[in-house]
């Protein structure tokens, strides 16, 4: 899966073009406006560089490996995939990482670069529309974005 392009092969001009949308089901511009923020690498970079934020998430996952070991995990809004990667490194049996934007393509590359492609599956979808092949034991999410 690659980033969307226009007829000339250029990347999208509008932020909302970076979001996987099904206009027949979701006709609300607020949906696109919410997700467009997280669809760009520079926004992900800003969040990853926030030391307090990352330490809090890191400690919550990495200091509690028993919560993940052998479990099936759902990462809602995976973004860069960092929580999914940490869950896999803590021994999760399978991690389904759901991302509504084309950031999913970058997350997949990061997962593969960390040798975790057999454990972490990136699913480009909204959480409302994703169909998981099995029930999960643990749900994780960076639901606070910039507000932690």
Regions found by a protein language model. Name each.
Residues 1-45, 65:
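Intrinsically disordered, low-complexity glycine/charged-rich regulatory or linker segments
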Residues 52-71:
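Conserved alpha-helix/loop element of class I SAM-dependent methyltransferases that forms part
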